[in-house]
Every structure is written in structure tokens, then in C-alpha cells.
Amino acid sequence: MFKGSCVALITPFTEDGVNYEELRKLLEWHIKNHTDAILVCGTTGEGSTMTLEEKKEVIKFSVEVVNKRVPVIAGTGTNNTKASIELSKYAEEVGADMVLIITPYYNKTSQKGLYAHFNAINDAINIPIMLYNVPSRTGMNITPLMLDKLADLNNVVAIKEASGDLSQVAKMAELCGDRIAIYSGNDDQIVPILSLGGAGVVSVLANILPEETHNICEKYFLGEVIESRNLQLKYLSLANSLFIETNPIPVKTAMNLMNFNCGPLRLPLCEMEDSNLVILEENLKANGLIK
């Protein structure tokens, strides 16, 4: 387990594959700038448009480069239980510290089916599982009562909670906060979720402000709550600008503007609208990230 900021890392692409030279640079940059954990092949990493072999290679490569300096979390969840198990087993074999398992999407199931999905994955592997709840993308919600049940599975140790519903997070904390670590899945709710006993954030913002996102959490844990809140608010407009279009379109655009060689988005994701690009650039300039 970790406390603090986990970057939901973008995947740098070339026109025909993954840019491993740039990926290595990003991994080293995050460690240098105090990122507390690194998630690869998640939503922000465009995992849904990567081939199985690309995912496997990115997970293996990242584990080798990071070399236990911080935890590496592998995004291995799909809407196919068998496929999720296969990739999760691979992540375990190559040394990932944890897997992130999203709720099934498109072929939405019942709460009973949701439990069966996570239970099957839990029984197939022997490394920690972080659940991922993002109903706006999947059409499915892990309810507090369901999380209370899932928290009894031996490998389920955490949840990335991106419902945006603080009342739901509070109920989760009440029911099973002593058995499962709750991480904010939204950069605009880091401090509110920390105040409910949260363990940190799985962050898009950390792609461009790794140390600052780490500091939001670190100051809170040190009891410097006002300073933590002030940092949350200082970067609020910038964080929101990263969602002016579908994530990860803005953050990958931002990183290329910041002279990282992150390459293109993969269809169906596409370039930003000009009007939104102006807003993103204004926020990057206001925070000294571009000239």
C-alpha cells in the first residue's frame, strides 16, 4: 500500500507503437519528483486502445525501470472477466505491486454479477487489488454496501473512487474504511476525500504537476491541513482544464505543449477543439508550465 499521489500515467505513443524511450524518461521524472506510485495502462494511459501485447510490454517495462523504488500498479481490468484474469496474472508474474480493476463497462451487470467478477479475479491472483469505480464512464456504480462486501475478499485492499459523490464516499468510509484504502479518483476532491480518511489520489494532474500533487497529500498527512487545502484550490482551475474534453485528451496535449514527446492520441480520441485548447494553454501559462 502507499499513501499519497499515484500518477495515472499517460502512455507515450509513436505513430505505430509505444515510445519506450519517452516512457522511461517519464518514469524517472516521476520518481525524481516524489510521485508516490505509478499506474500504467489505465484510462489516462489509453489502455482501451492498446493491444494485449502492448499492455503486457508496458507493464513489464515499467516494473523493470521503476525497480521497486515506488509501487507500480497495472491497469488490468476489462469488461471480460477471463481477459482481466489473464492480464492480472501476467502483471503478477512480472512483478507489478498491485492491479487496478475497473467495473465491467458496456455489458453492464447486476450487483451480483459485479461481485462475481471481482471475486473470480481475486481468487485467481495473489497480489493486491485496487477496485476502480467510475460510473460516468462505465454505467455501473460500486455501492457502499457492495464495497463493504468486496472488502472481505483477501486481495481487495483499495478503491479508486471517482463517482464524484462525497456522500457515497463518506458511507464507504463508515462501512469499511478500516478494511480498505480509499483513494480519490478526482483531482478536485483530493482534500475532501483525505478528510474522510482517504489514503491519497490516483491523479491525472500529477502527469504535469507531480511534486505539487504529492505535496497536497503530504501536507495533509503532516497535519498542515490549511496548506493542503490552499494547494488544492491553487491548482483547481488547472485540474479542471484537464477535463475540458474527455480525459486523456487535454493532459496529453498539455504534456506535448510542455515539450514532452508523448506523441499522438489513438482514435477514437482526437485533437482538442481550438476553443478548448486556448483555455488549456491559458491555465498552463498561469501556472508557469509553458510560456
Swiss-Prot record:
UniProt organism field: Clostridium perfringens (strain ATCC 13124 / DSM 756 / JCM 1290 / NCIMB 6125 / NCTC 8237 / Type A)
Class in the EC hierarchy, top level: lyase
Pathway: Amino-acid biosynthesis; L-lysine biosynthesis via DAP pathway; (S)-tetrahydrodipicolinate from L-aspartate: step 3/4
InterPro entries per the UniProt record, alphabetical: Aldolase_TIM (IPR013785), DapA (IPR005263), DapA-like (IPR002220), Schiff_base-form_aldolases_AS (IPR020625), Schiff_base-form_aldolases_CS (IPR020624)
Top-rank lineage group of the source organism: Bacteria
Lineage: Bacteria, Bacillati, Bacillota, Clostridia, Eubacteriales
Protein name (Swiss-Prot/TrEMBL): 4-hydroxy-tetrahydrodipicolinate synthase
Entry keyword set: Amino-acid biosynthesis, Cytoplasm, Diaminopimelate biosynthesis, Lyase, Lysine biosynthesis, Schiff base
GO cellular component: a single term: cytosol
Assembly with partners or alone: Homotetramer; dimer of dimers.
Cellular compartment(s): Cytoplasm
BP GO annotations: diaminopimelate biosynthetic process; lysine biosynthetic process via diaminopimelate
Site residues (Part of a proton relay during catalysis), renumbered to this chain: T43, Y106
Gene this chain is encoded by: dapA
